């Protein structure tokens, strides 16, 4: 089925196709955070150590990040319908396998499959946006898509905990797997590939590889990928791993309020995604939101780390602003598409997303390494306790990342929301 013309492209079918893609990304974020909610059950049922639990959690990111670029190539060559449907099927099977696992090894295999299956959620949806919805609204709709993903993360926390308390963790993740199977069926039956979505299929493999080499040889691709990693990795490392600890030990918040403070930061991140895309589309410029996001992140990180113990409201406002500014990273996807050959859009956004997720995968263990270096030796109930000073020293890596993001802005090319290559 061919894509409709520009003037009529925004039809009900086009929006339904996008909605299914956005649901895929929602599912990706939901699956990403669920293990953090059931960590005690996992350690109990698998007799897992902290290191082993870390391996189980990291399995998702390993396949998710590693497959971004290959998935982008497959999207360009074969179109989103088949790739996204098969991927959702794999994720659903992986989640069901995870729920049925009786030992750690098959559980890790299940999570590897989940990561592999949901990895196409964002880049596949952006590919659908490129070919079914108006190009002038690409950044805005991409931001809304990523906001929907953050909603998945929020629903994957406290609501999932409530369900686990009623059904148990195995039943919960098995039902999550069943949703993946239904999503696969919906994508297969409803999503249609346009002529543009698989244009690379008509090229020779030599032509495809030449195009991919042009992406990797483009300094702008690397500059934007670096920005993506440096702006998104700190907020995701903070909110999904160490932020609650910091809020308790450094700001003196109660455990419940510390968790809530990270939800506030995630809410800011979620709102920053569509607002950053909208601002970019309205301004007719890509670099301004990127500049603003990086500078505001740098300032807010420094205040967060240097203010000894701010009032609760001030702490929540700081976390929200930091998340909001971090969400403006969304504009890099639009700019990356505009400074590379348009027919390889899936490959471009896959590479940018790979660098962003790869930044998280590197920064999380590196932050843990820094904490161990600054640890004063305190142990409670067999668990290392990191002091306020150790946390603040280790987390200086976050504003350092923001500073790199600011520096990268000097080397970006402004597209003025126009396709400048190809």
Model regions: which residues?
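Juxtamembrane intracellular "pre-TM" segments in multi-pass secondary transporters
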Residues: 3-10, 193-225
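Extracytoplasmic gate region of multi-pass secondary transporters
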Residues: 35-37, 218-276, 333, 360-371
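Helix-breaking motifs and short loop linkers at transmembrane-helix boundaries and internal kinks
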Residues: 47, 79, 100-106, 134, ...
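Conserved MFS/SLC helix-loop-helix module at the cytosolic interface between two early adjacent transmembrane helices
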Residues: 66-105
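Cytoplasmic membrane-interface "Motif A"-like loop-to-helix N-cap segments
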Residues: 77-87, 281-295
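C-terminal ends and interior cores of transmembrane alpha-helices
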Residues: 89-102, 295-309
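Cytoplasmic helix-loop-helix junction between adjacent transmembrane helices
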Residues: 110-149
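Helix-loop-helix hairpin linking two adjacent transmembrane segments in secondary transporters
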Residues: 145-193
């Amino acid at each position: 089925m061919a894509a409709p013309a520009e003037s009529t492209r925004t039809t009900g079918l086009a929006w339904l196709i996008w909605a299914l893609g956005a649901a895929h990304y929602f599912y990706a974020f939901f699956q990403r955070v669920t293990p953090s909610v059931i960590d005690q059950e996992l350690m109990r049922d698998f007799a897992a150590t902290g290191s082993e639990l870390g391996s189980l959690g990291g399995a998702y990111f390993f396949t998710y990040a590693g497959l971004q670029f290959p998935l982008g190539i497959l999207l360009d060559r074969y179109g989103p319908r088949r790739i996204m449907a098969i991927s959702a099927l794999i994720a659903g099977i992986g989640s069901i396998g995870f729920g049925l696992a009786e030992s750690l090894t098959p559980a890790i295999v299940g999570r590897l499959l989940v990561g592999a299956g949901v990895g196409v959620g964002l880049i596949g949806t952006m590919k659908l946006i490129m070919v079914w919805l108006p190009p002038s609204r690409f950044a805005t709709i991409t931001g809304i898509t990523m906001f929907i993903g953050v909603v998945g993360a929020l629903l994957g926390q406290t609501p999932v905990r409530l369900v686990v308390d009623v059904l148990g963790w195995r039943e919960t993740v098995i039902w999550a797997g069943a949703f993946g199977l239904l999503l696969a069926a919906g994508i297969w039956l409803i999503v249609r590939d346009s002529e543009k979505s698989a244009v690379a299929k008509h090229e020779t493999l030599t032509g495809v590889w030449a195009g991919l080499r042009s992406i990797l040889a483009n300094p702008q691709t690397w500059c934007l990928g670096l920005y993506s990693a440096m702006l998104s990795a700190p907020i995701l490392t903070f909110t999904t791993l160490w932020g609650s600890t910091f809020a308790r030990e450094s700001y003196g918040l109660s455990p419940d309020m510390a968790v809530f403070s990270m939800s506030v930061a995630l809410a800011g991140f979620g709102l920053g995604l569509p607002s950053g895309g909208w601002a970019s589309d309205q301004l007719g410029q890509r670099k301004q939101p990127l500049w603003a996001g990086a500078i505001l992140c740098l300032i807010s990180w420094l205040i967060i780390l240097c203010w000894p113990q701010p009032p609760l409201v001030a702490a929540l406002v700081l976390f929200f602003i930091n998340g909001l500014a971090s969400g403006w990273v969304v504009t890099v996807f639009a700019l990356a598409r505009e400074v590379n050959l348009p027919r390889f859009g899936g490959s471009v956004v896959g590479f940018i997303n790979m660098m962003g997720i790869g930044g998280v995968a590197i920064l999380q263990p590196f932050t843990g390494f820094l904490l161990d270096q600054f640890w004063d030796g305190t142990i409670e109930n067999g668990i290392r306790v990191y002091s306020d000073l150790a946390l603040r020293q280790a987390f200086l890596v976050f504003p350092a990342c923001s500073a790199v993001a600011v520096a990268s802005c000097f080397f970006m090319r402004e597209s003025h929301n126009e396709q400048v290559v190809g």
